[in-house]
């Protein structure tokens, strides 16, 4: 989800990872030659990285909503399971914030994600209003998703 990337952690950002596949080191390798080389200009590298950041964030949002829905509907059977799912939703949401912020992308979506994270953290530490807080977090996650999918 977030850097560093590759088996040796050599690349810190997704932009750097995309640029690697555009560079001479990859293009002169057997794998690069097998695909005929990749030639992108700087704008295309940034656009591909932005696309990957948004796709990653959309998947994290999907996972967070899937984890929070049973909590909101109060269909989870054990407190341990509730805590585990809420904790995982918090991690996925935090990751979404880092991924978008790291690319300077979709600041309004980041604000929705930050509000969702606040609600998730309240649900994580509360008992009485956990379902309501999970539901509010889902609403904020859905707003973030809509912001990312808006076509301009």
Where are the language model's segments positioned?
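Periplasmic c-type cytochrome electron-transfer domains
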Residues: 1-152
């Amino acid at each position: 989800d977030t850097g560093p990337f590759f088996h040796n952690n050599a690349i810190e950002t997704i932009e750097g990872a995309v640029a690697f596949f555009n560079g001479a080191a990859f293009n002169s390798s057997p794998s690069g030659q097998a695909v005929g080389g990749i030639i992108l200009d700087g704008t295309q590298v940034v656009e591909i990285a932005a696309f990957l950041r948004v796709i990653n964030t959309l998947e994290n949002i999907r996972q967070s909503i899937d984890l929070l829905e049973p909590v909101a509907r109060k269909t989870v059977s054990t407190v341990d399971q509730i805590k585990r799912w809420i904790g995982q939703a918090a991690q996925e949401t935090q990751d979404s914030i880092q991924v978008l912020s790291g690319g300077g992308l979709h600041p309004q979506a980041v604000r929705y994600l930050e509000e969702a994270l606040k609600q998730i953290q309240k649900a994580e530490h509360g008992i009485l209003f956990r379902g309501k807080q999970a539901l509010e977090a889902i609403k904020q996650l859905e707003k973030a998703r809509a912001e990312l999918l808006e076509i301009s």
